[in-house]
Amino acid sequence: MIRPQPNLVVMAGGVSSRMKKSLRDASISSEIAAAAAKVHKALIPLGKSKRPLIARLLTHAQKAGYTKVYLIVAEHDTAFQQWWKQLPATDPLKKLQLYFAFQNTPNNREKPLGTADALYQAMLQYPQLQQSSFTVCNGDNLYGIDSLQQLLAPRSAPNALIAYDREGLQYPAARIAQFALLQMDAQGFLKGIVEKPKLETLENFRDTEGKLRVSMNIFSLQGDLLFSYFRDCPIDPVRQEKELPQALRNYIQEQPKTVRCFPQYAHLPDLTSAADVSSFA
């Protein structure tokens, strides 16, 4: 029986390019727009409380039982470190052990090399992650406490992910159509992750309950099993990045029935564009 360790890796090293491009067209206050133009979207003040998404996500993680957080940020980041430093000592989040990992950008690139590379660099900087289990997720999605808890629960499979019911996601249909679909076997093990499948093939992806399941980039992984796959992940020919889903595809091709899919019916608030800011109370 696998008993996952309470480690959470949050990927927040991106440059928030889609958010910044959308600022002109969004109906948000000048204060929020100014913040969004300067800092990572996970640090934008949200709702009446002005509590940013990263604080909300870490609160959910803490309530779910996580005690250590590895926050992957851009190589020259100061904003996340300043946010953490300025949190009052009385804030419950200060009970977390938080470590910063920095994703360096290669000299010949303007942007980081992708999510698989982010994890690889974090595991180099914190070698304990190469020998332990951890949950990894995006820094711009507000994952529910139950999803985070599910990935901490004892299980038989070494790795796991949350398989979201596509019908539960309250996004525009065109946006949902862009999400990767999961292929699962009858026992609920991951067989594949397919990006932007053709409309006429959708019926082939329904699970035993007749549901279409999508990945929202939240996984529970064994570091010793996945480290080499992150290191050796090929660069996607279109996006020109090393992507976590591709590393996972390569892994399950060689090690089938090692990633358990846990179904979930829930909406997942996120901050892809400036229009999403108003969805947070």
Predicted regions and their residues:
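A structural signal for short hydrophobic beta-strand segments in well-ordered beta-sheet cores
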Residues: 43, 181-184, 261
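Conserved beta-loop-beta/alpha segment of the NTase-like Rossmann-fold superfamily
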Residues: 95-181
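Conserved core of the sugar-phosphate nucleotidyltransferase
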Residues: 144-228
